[in-house]
Design a protein with these regions (language model features):
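Membrane-interfacial amphipathic/re-entrant helices at transmembrane-helix boundaries
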Residues: 1-20, 48, 58-63, 89-93, ...
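Hydrophobic alpha-helical transmembrane segments of polytopic membrane proteins
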Residues: 19, 24, 71-73, 224-247, ...
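Membrane-embedded helix boundary and interhelical linker motif in transport proteins
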Residues: 8, 30-77, 81
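Inter-helical junctions in multi-pass inner-membrane proteins, predominant
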Residues: 1-16, 159-160, 164, 190-229, ...
Length: 291
């Protein structure tokens, strides 16, 4: 029974990692660059939700929808104003820019008096609720994370499988030049990809905040989400979720069964093992370029 409790806890944490990793993969597939600002976008989403609930007095569900919409718009504007002008530059330059964006977002949050430097509780309706089922003590906050992740994955599957927008995004991710000559608005799709990644990061922040707290440093969890994207296969959306679940589960089990300190390094040990066994990740494809 203890093992099952640990697995549920690990799956819930892994869902958070997986959602942030989805943002990594969405942006990578759209622009072939890596955004290390995903953790800070998650943190910003949590603060937006907190502001909507406590300052604006919005009800919970309206706060969630408003936060997701606001972060999606922020992601689109970020791509248009900051990222798009330097596309075509060396990938290292874009990566460093995203790291800088993360620092700027965190710095701006900490500058807000009585908010940015404090730890806050997100007032959700299911805070601290417990379900007792078949001898298991289930944390409702964790179950909401798992359920919401499952629903979001289903919605993303429908988007990319059946909608014209999703199919166009897949085509652009395979070959942007060919997609451009076929009349697909590649630049617009890049902006949508950034907006979608920011919205998913906001959802992750709103799901994580009730389990932990809302604070300026919660964005550092993105450092655990990056290994999830690597394990799943950088470029695979299902792989991001599976990688997150693996990282979360290993982290939960190692934190209980292994000595102190192993929990924080478990994610990177898994990455090292994966790079040795399967360098392209579980769902990654081996790409060959003819010269």
């Amino acid at each position: 029974m203890q093992l099952l409790q640990l697995l549920i806890s690990g799956i819930a944490q892994g869902c958070i990692y997986g959602l942030i990793a989805l943002g990594f993969v969405l942006i990578y597939k759209a622009t072939e660059t890596v955004s290390f600002a995903q953790g800070e976008l998650m943190m910003l989403g949590a603060f937006c939700g907190l502001a909507a609930m406590t300052m604006l007095g919005f009800p919970y569900w309206l706060s969630v929808l408003a936060t997701i919409a606001a972060m999606a718009l922020f992601g689109v504007l970020l791509e248009r104003i900051v990222i798009r002008p330097i596309l075509g530059q060396p990938a290292f330059s874009i990566v460093m820019l995203t790291i800088g964006i993360g620092y700027v977002v965190r710095g701006l949050i900490t500058m807000i008096p009585a908010i940015g430097t404090e730890t806050h509780t997100l007032p959700v309706p299911y805070k601290d609720q417990i379900w007792n089922w078949a001898g298991l003590v289930l944390n409702v906050e964790q179950m909401v994370v798992i359920a919401a992740t499952a629903v979001l994955c289903a919605l993303l599957y429908l988007l990319f499988r059946y909608s014209k927008l999703g199919i166009a995004m897949q085509a652009a991710s395979q070959n942007q030049l060919a997609a451009y000559y076929m009349g697909i608005p590649v630049n617009r799709l890049n902006g949508i990809a950034w907006g979608l990644a920011a919205a998913v990061a906001a959802i992750a922040g709103l799901l994580l905040a009730p389990i932990t707290f809302v604070h300026a440093n919660m964005g550092f969890i993105g450092l655990k989400a990056f290994p999830a994207a690597v394990v799943g296969g950088f470029g695979s959306l299902p792989g991001a979720i599976v990688g997150g679940l693996i990282i979360g589960t290993v982290e939960s089990l190692s934190g209980f069964y292994l000595p102190n300190g192993f929990k924080d390094t478990a994610a990177y040990v898994v990455v090292l093992v994966m790079l040795v066994i399967k360098p392209n990740g579980l769902f990654g494809e081996k790409l060959r370029k003819k010269v």
